Each structure stands twice: as structure tokens, then as C-alpha cells.
Curated annotation (Swiss-Prot):
GO terms for molecular function: phospholipase A2 inhibitor activity. The keyword Isomerase does not apply. Disulfide bonds join C6-C13. It is found in: Secreted. Expressed by the liver. This is Phospholipase A2 inhibitor gamma subunit B1. Belongs to the CNF-like-inhibitor family.
Length: 19
């Protein structure tokens, strides 16, 4: 599953947290 919105820290992107 690809992440749609991961701009804010803590958002889950591909199972990883976007910092």
C-alpha cells in the first residue's frame, strides 16, 4: 500500500513513520 499523504511527522508512509 502506497502512502497518499505523509507530510506531517508521525504519518504512516509504507509502514514507516515519515519524519
Amino acid at each position: 500500500i502506497e502512502c497518499e499523504v505523509c507530510m506531517k511527522p508521525g504519518d504512516r508512509c509504507n509502514g514507516s513513520m515519515m519524519t
